Amino acid sequence: MKMKNTDIKNNWTTKELKDIYDLPFNDLLWKAQSVHRKYHNPNEIQISTLMSIKTGGCPEDCKYCSQSIRYDTDINLEKTLPLSDIIKQAKNARDNGASRFCMGAAWRNLTQSNLAKVKEMVKEVKALGLETCVTLGMLTDTQADELKNVGLDYYNHNLDTSEEY
């Protein structure tokens, strides 16, 4: 039931993308659900845990985000958490059924000194038998490769394109 890399289409034409975009919403949901059911048991869910490893002080101006330093929120600027705190939370997540542990930081982009810390976090969390995920802002290609090489499974990056933000 697991998806093979050969099943992933990555050569979409503009017309094909437009055809998907123009689908009525319920038809789009049906097609998405059909693909999901083809490759996954529809009655199973994956439990993931997200932990903020560095809270507050992000220089970006996303109006909806409490992490932004540009708005008056109740979020205090905190330093990056020590590795021991992160591993303790990852173990707790695993022991409570999570199979993926995502670490998020309020950064615009990743500095080299923070990259070294995050690489160690990824290695240690991976050693616990968890899938690893991070959301750290913008990365260079080299940084992405370095994270991949230490075992990172997933990278989340929010793309905020609304004129409202």
Residue ranges and their predicted role:
Residues 1-64:
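Flexible, acidic/Gly-rich N-terminal and inter-domain linker regions that tether
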